[in-house]
Amino acid sequence: MKLVPSNCLNHSEKLLWTFVDGDFLYFIDSTYALYEYDLNNHKAYFIADMEAEILRRGEVSSIIKQKTDYFIGFKSSGLIQLKYMPDSKVKYSLQSINVQSGIFCLMKDRFQDIIWVGADGQGLYMYFTDEFSIDNIMLDVPEYRVDNPVRALYQDQDQTL
């Protein structure tokens, strides 16, 4: 087997962060613009200018899309949601989510409208997109004793957390 480099994106700017979710890539380029790239039709779609938020919060650790909204985790400064506003001139509204620590990973639950958030020092969060609430599963209680931050979430062969 041989790997051959390919430049299928043909994007003019340098990519700073790239994340994969199924048939889609989410990337932020050197102008701090967030794009969604469809691997099937090979088209990139501009989503939002993230410059002010990245300059304020720092390095991006994870990006996922849940329905029409984007969730962006920052390595040392929390989680934001780009909420789709179909009737607005600006299509996405930035909303801060109440997680005050670094975000290491985001994962969509395949059975429910839940986003699992692995946080630095605050354990594992469940963000319920329908109820607009967030809950923390503290990993320092005896049933879940974990002394380290949640840096990654894994699925088994049945695709369960």
Model-identified regions with their sequence ranges:
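Carboxylate-rich, polar loop motifs that coordinate divalent cations or form catalytic acidic clusters
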Residues: 1-161
